[in-house]
């Protein structure tokens, strides 16, 4: 299965059969290389990936300044230390799950809820971890 298939079928999927979808999704290597992404996923800056990776190594690193994705600021909210970073911006937000080799990104807007985004992103992330990825 290609990485693009994971994004298309497992991240940009119909959530709970409700006809709702994430706004954007991506799978990115720890080095910042894009493995696959939805057409709507914003262009990440190298320093943003560096900051995200540092926050996984040193939880709380991004909290004072915020999480930036393509220059857009998200307020960092409760995640899972070293495993999941979550951010909020207005009625939407972002979930980032770290696997052994990749970062799984999901960006949502209403009517998708933070919990739905977390479920979709973390489910794929957990599967990739089980597969040694």
UniProtKB/Swiss-Prot annotation:
Keywords: Actin-binding, Allergen, Cytoplasm, Cytoskeleton. InterPro entries: PFN, PFN_euk, PFN_sf, Profilin_CS. SMART domains: PROF. GO terms for molecular function: actin monomer binding. It is found in: Cytoplasm, Cytoskeleton. GO terms for cellular component: cell cortex; cytoskeleton. PROSITE patterns: PROFILIN. Binds to actin and affects the structure of the cytoskeleton. At high concentrations, profilin prevents the polymerization of actin, whereas it enhances it at low concentrations. By binding to PIP2, it inhibits the formation of IP3 and DG. Occurs in many kinds of cells as a complex with monomeric actin in a 1:1 ratio. This is Profilin. It comes from Mercurialis annua. The lineage of its organism: Eukaryota, Viridiplantae, Streptophyta, Embryophyta, Tracheophyta.
């Amino acid at each position: 299965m290609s990485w693009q298939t994971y994004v298309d079928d497992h991240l940009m999927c119909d959530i709970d059969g409700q006809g709702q979808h994430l706004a954007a999704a991506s799978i990115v290597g720890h080095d910042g290389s894009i493995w696959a992404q939805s057409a709507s996923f914003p262009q990440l800056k190298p320093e943003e990936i560096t900051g995200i990776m540092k926050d996984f190594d040193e939880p709380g690193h991004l909290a004072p300044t915020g999480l930036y994705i393509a220059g857009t600021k998200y307020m960092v909210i409760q995640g899972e230390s070293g495993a999941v970073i979550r951010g909020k911006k207005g009625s939407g937000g972002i979930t980032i799950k770290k696997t052994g080799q990749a970062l799984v990104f999901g960006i949502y807007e209403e009517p998708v809820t933070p919990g739905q985004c977390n479920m979709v992103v973390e489910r794929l992330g957990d599967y990739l971890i089980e597969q040694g990825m």
